Swiss-Prot record:
Reported effect, L82R: In HH16; uncertain significance
Compartments where located: Secreted
Gene: SEMA3A
Residue ranges constituting the Sema domain according to the UniProt record: 31-514
Protein name, per record: Semaphorin-3A
GO CC annotation terms, alphabetical: axon; extracellular region; extracellular space; glutamatergic synapse; plasma membrane
Spans annotated as Disordered: 728-771
Primary location group: secreted
Similarity comment: family membership: Belongs to the semaphorin family.
Its biological purpose: Involved in the development of the olfactory system and in neuronal control of puberty. Induces the collapse and paralysis of neuronal growth cones. Could serve as a ligand that guides specific growth cones by a motility-inhibiting mechanism. Binds to the complex neuropilin-1/plexin-1.
Single GO BP term: axonogenesis involved in innervation
Length: 771
């Protein structure tokens, strides 16, 4: 019974080690890592590799009702079928030769800049889209007819109605823009000049006069990079609706020592029409606040992620209080990292109702404004809810004056839990895009994040509460490569109706399903360990989880991922595909061999056991100079007869132990190998010794070299060994007698005889092909 006790202790030790690895941040590693080839082979990705004369598939518009994805690119607008993006329509919208030549004469790149890059693509009404492009540094806009119904199959450009795109689309295709079309009015954050210096938030189209932010005032906007724009209701009264812009900009003078970038959220009232005597045709309700995304550090020194890259609003039950997800990266060139922070709109509104930023004191630093704030409070929308003013043109002069000089709030907006929910550092990529799906699971609702990177991969991450629903744990489920070549992901859309994810980049468009339950495995434990809210064990396979379906055999544990509790009553026999793979490997004595075993899950802890021939006892393999352990398996050096036996590869994850592989290693001694090599074609080994004695010198040379090669215990001297063989060969060639004209005729007949013998014995002297 002693050996049984030792095995039990060994298993408990492995379990404790596995749990320790989890506590040390093992969840930060993707459980599954799928290459582009694996995604293709498993039919989990569909790619549109773009057209030869187009690129920059960055502008997305998702239409769930028509089951279409509209994409703006270079000189083209596409309409993709949501079921399969291989089915698409296209509109060609290039610039004229005159515009292109003018752009070229202005010193711009004719291929990368002097084209019509689509920057704005919005739904205008039930039958038309509104599109704007850079127009080779001459912005232009028009309408696209899509018909009343999806079956109309209409997708064409309104060639008779082109508009000036200034204040709607940037001139430079490299500049970011954010836009929103509401009730026939276009809200845009963009640059309004050729040089890309006059940045503003505009409202154009519609029946009202265009309106914008204050010009040439860094307190309002300081070289911003616009990310996105969203309409969010403040109350049940539509007059209180506000448009929020997310952007990053240079820090205001005095706000930070040295040059720095800050992430911002800006607000404007939808019913803002500018002032009467001051701020005419300018926003009177514009306010902005800083978005903080940082990791708390010792002594109050935080690590900040200030480069806002993307924003996603998760609307659920209350449209007035969506959850804001923001993707951030670091500004430092030394420390590169990415993070996802989550914000509540109640915190945002609290900041906009807080103190204004004001410069005062001997050092003229930014301090909270302590004076009297005029009524109605600047930033409040004119409505019956919060005042009694019918229009911003009726606001008192002191309100307009205060709003003009105090556009920034003093307090920043901190993320929920005061820290990011996802952090990635020390990796070869940074986050660029994010979309989020709220999924119903057996034990609650979970937000599943799909995060795009600058190398063309998508991370699937779920936030799981630990002790409470506010203390979240980051679990990285999958890392998927969706493009053949590394390229930055610049656009993402998620279709809950089709359960598909759509991704855009410079190279093309990709489509992949939100869930791939079958890839997790064919056992209940494997499905439970995945902790994927989309998937559950249905009694026979890991399949899509539907909350409405009632099955007693359904097994799912997202919060803990504990297969020992949920799958302990299930016995997985061979027909469930749970039996380990078996292999037989032959190795040569004194040589090296490699036993390959890598689990599907990158979070699993792998350990090996060895079982000698005709023995039941198994012992754990210890790593030493003889056995080297790698992520891919075991390397056994200088094999001996005692190494023959069974090698068992086990994977431990979250307390669950699974045998992945059983390798039977047969070590062949050198004498036996010599007999095998010298057997004749008839399989008669009795002539082995006679054949060895009759070998020519050249045969013995290659045989000696071969045996020395396979028997050489030190792999590091392989180059030295080859060098010795080459030196000997060169030395033998130099020692051959030279041919002189005087004795050439004398030895001519001997040379001819030698040629004949060489022809007859050539095949015999060649090394066997099996070698």
């Amino acid at each position: 019974m002693g050996w049984l006790t030792r095995i039990v202790c060994l298993f408990w030790g492995v379990l404790l080690t596995a749990r320790a690895n989890y506590q040390n941040g093992k969840n930060n590693v993707p459980r599954l890592k799928l290459s582009y080839k694996e995604m293709l082979e498993s039919n989990n990705v569909i790619t549109f590799n773009g057209l030869a004369n187009s690129s920059s598939y960055h502008t997305f518009l998702l239409d769930e009702e028509r089951s279409r994805l509209y994409v703006g690119a270079k000189d083209h607008i596409f309409s993709f079928d949501l079921v399969n993006i291989k089915d698409f329509q296209k509109i060609v919208w290039p610039v004229s030769y005159t515009r292109r030549d003018e752009c070229k004469w202005a010193g711009k790149d004719i291929l990368k800049e002097c084209a019509n890059f689509i920057k704005v693509l919005k739904a205008y009404n039930q039958t038309h889209l509104y599109a704007c492009g850079t127009g080779a540094f001459h912005p232009i806009c028009t309408y696209i007819e899509i018909g009343h119904h999806p079956e109309d199959n209409i997708f064409k450009l309104e060639n008779s109605h082109f508009e000036n795109g200034r204040g709607k689309s940037p001139y430079d295709p490299k500049l970011l823009t954010a836009s929103l079309l509401i009730d026939g009015e276009l809200y845009s954050g963009t640059a309004a000049d050729f040089m890309g210096r006059d940045f503003a938030i505009f409202r154009t189209l519609g029946h009202h006069h265009p309106i914008r932010t204050e010009q040439h005032d860094s307190r309002w906007l300081n070289d911003p990079k616009f990310i996105s724009a969203h309409l969010i209701s403040e109350s049940d009264n539509p007059e209180d609706d506000k448009v929020y812009f997310f952007f990053r900009e240079n820090a205001i003078d005095g706000e930070h020592s040295g040059k720095a970038t800050h992430a911002r959220i800006g607000q404007i009232c939808k019913n803002d029409f500018g002032g009467h005597r001051s701020l005419v045709n300018k926003w009177t309700t514009f306010l902005k606040a800083r978005l903080i995304c940082s990791v708390p550090g010792p002594n109050g020194i935080d690590t900040h992620f200030d480069e806002l890259q993307d924003v996603f609003l998760m609307n659920f039950k209350d449209p007035k209080n969506p959850v804001v997800y923001g993707v951030f990266t670091t500004s430092s060139n030394i420390f590169k990292g990415s993070a996802v922070c989550m914000y509540s709109m109640s915190d945002v509104r609290r900041v906009f109702l807080g103190p204004y930023a004001h410069r005062d004191g001997p050092n003229y630093q930014w301090v909270p404004y302590q004076g009297r704030v005029p009524y109605p409070r600047p930033g409040t929308c004119p409505s019956k809810t919060f005042g009694g003013f019918d229009s911003t043109k009726d606001l008192p002069d002191d309100v307009i004056t205060f709003a003009r000089s105090h556009p920034a709030m003093y307090n920043p907006v901190f993320p929920m839990n005061n820290r990011p929910i996802v952090i990635k550092t020390d990796v070869n990529y940074q986050f660029t895009q994010i979309v989020v799906d709220r999924v119903d699971a057996e034990d609650g609702q979970y937000d599943v994040m799909f995060i795009g990177t600058d190398v063309g991969t998508v991370l699937k991450v779920v936030s799981i509460p630990k002790e409470t629903w506010y203390d979240l744990e980051e679990v990285l489920l999958e890392e998927m490569t969706v493009f053949r070549e590394p390229t930055a992901i610049s656009a993402m859309e998620l279709s809950t109706k089709q359960q598909q994810l759509y991704i855009g980049s410079t190279a093309g468009v990709a489509q992949l399903p939100l869930h791939r339950c079958d890839i997790y495995g064919k056992a209940c434990a494997e499905c439970c360990l995945a902790r994927d809210p989309y998937c559950a064990w249905d009694g026979s396979a890991c399949s899509r989880y539907f909350p409405t379906a009632k099955r007693r055999t359904r097994r799912q544990d997202i919060r803990n991922g504990d297969p020992l509790t949920h799958c302990s009553d299930l016995h997985h026999d061979n027909h469930h595909g749970h039996s380990p793979e078996e292999r037989i490997i032959y190795g040569v004595e004194n040589s090296s061999t490699f036993l390959e075993c890598s689990p599907k899950s990158q979070r699993a802890l792998v350990y090996w056991q060895f079982q000698r021939r005709n023995e039941e006892r198994k012992e754990e393999i210890r790593v030493d100079d003889h056995i080297i352990r790698t992520d891919q398996g075991l390397l056994l050096r200088s094999l001996q007869q005692k190494d023959s036996g069974n090698y068992l590869c086990h994977a431990v994850e979250h307390g669950f132990i699974q045998t992945l592989l059983k390798v039977t290693l047969e070590v062949i001694d050198t004498e036996h190998l010599e007999e095998l090599l010298h057997k004749d074609d008839d399989g008669d080994g009795s002539k082995t010794k006679e054949m060895s004695n009759s070998m020519t010198p050249s045969q013995k040379v290659w045989y000696r070299d071969f045996m020395q090669l396979i028997n050489h215990p030190n792999l590091n001297t392989m180059d030295e060994f080859c060098e010795q063989v080459w030196k000997r060969d060169r030395k033998q060639r130099r020692q051959r007698p030279g041919h002189t004209p005087g004795n050439s005729n004398k030895w001519k007949h001997l040379q001819e005889n030698k040629k004949g013998r060489n022809r007859r014995t050539h095949e015999f002297e060649r090394a066997p092909r099996s070698v």
